[in-house]
Amino acid sequence: MLNTYNDKYLLYPVLYFYGFGNGILFKALLQNKNHQHIVVFEKDIEIIWIMFHILDFSNELQSARLMILENDKLQAQDYTELCSSKPFFQFSRIYFLELMSHYYERFHEDILGLNKKLAENFKNIILRNGNDPKDALQGIEQFVYNLPQMITHPSY
């Protein structure tokens, strides 16, 4: 499983997971300096409590490289703060919510709801901040470049 993440998401600065599992994967992923933050949403807080007695995550938690959120306790404001802060907002285009293990598939309703809330919040934050002026200038440049072709070769 670690090889999959190292192949696909080696340079991703933010990773999102549903479920904490045994925590060993997170310990390994946090060895990669490119991963600035790993956000874990967990429904069963007892799993985290048990794993904290086995593995030490104190440095990762203090530096906020590992963020564990109990998704049943999150309010709308929590989602907004997470999605609008750096680097989460900056890398919102590469957002995905990954399951920690097959065990968490039985929580598919919660996962879909969480994914929907996060996607909606990212969308709202993006719309609130507006488009990047570089995108608008690129669109104008492409329009002007293609204008002679559109005038001389109409599609109808």
Put a short name on every predicted segment.
Residues M1-Y156:
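N-terminal donor/sugar-recognition subdomains of glycan-related enzymes
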